[in-house]
């Protein structure tokens, strides 16, 4: 009897551990899907029109061109994509953002570009995590009608590399966004 009880409890514990582990590793289907396209390590498809990644290399730009990406929105503060994209048909856009001091106005201006360029579009910064994550979270709220909570959850937990210990300012900015005001400024509310 004691042996059976021990076996039963052991089985029960293993079952609970397995279930809790598998539930914690399930990625919501609405979150961006990782794309395996060398040389990228942080390339995701947000929706049929928008992708996100780290800084593309020259090889990366060619791969994006072959994938059918039409436009690139760089959020890099210093570097441009001109040299890397030289031998492609990609349309290059740049909106320079400093990660430490990103403002609501910069988010809206970046979204305005993203909404109006030829699609599909890739949004990137250096690592594809902080500035890119902020703009994609705002895109989720303004264009895809996500709740603020869901957009921030994906931003923080999506595996894109958000540096929360350094850039809490981005979380504060996203928390303060008035979604209806942002939609109105972008012409998304009639």
Predicted regions and their residues:
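Cys-dependent protein tyrosine phosphatase-like superfamily
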Residues: 20-121, 134-190
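Short cysteine clusters
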Residues: 125
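Bacterial N-terminal signal peptides
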Residues: 8-20
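Substrate/cofactor-recognition hotspot
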Residues: 128
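Bacterial N-terminal signal peptides that target proteins for export
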Residues: 1-9
């Amino acid at each position: 009897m004691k042996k059976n009880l021990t076996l039963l409890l052991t089985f029960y514990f293993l079952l609970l551990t397995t279930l809790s582990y598998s539930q914690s590793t399930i990625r919501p289907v609405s979150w961006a899907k990782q794309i395996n396209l060398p040389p990228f390590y942080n390339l995701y498809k947000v929706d049929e029109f928008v992708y996100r990644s780290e800084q593309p290399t020259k090889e990366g730009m060619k791969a994006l061109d072959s994938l059918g990406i039409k436009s690139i929105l760089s959020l890099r503060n210093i570097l441009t994509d001109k040299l890397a994209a030289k031998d492609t048909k990609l349309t290059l856009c740049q909106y320079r953002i400093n990660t430490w001091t990103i403002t609501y106005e910069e988010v809206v201006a970046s979204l305005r570009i993203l909404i109006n360029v030829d699609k599909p579009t890739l949004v990137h910064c250096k690592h594809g995590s902080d500035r890119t994550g902020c703009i994609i979270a705002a895109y989720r709220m303004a264009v895809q009608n996500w709740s603020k909570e869901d957009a921030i959850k994906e931003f923080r937990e999506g595996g894109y590399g958000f540096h929360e210990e350094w850039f809490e300012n981005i979380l504060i900015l996203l928390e303060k966004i008035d979604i209806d005001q942002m939609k109105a400024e972008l012409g998304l509310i009639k």
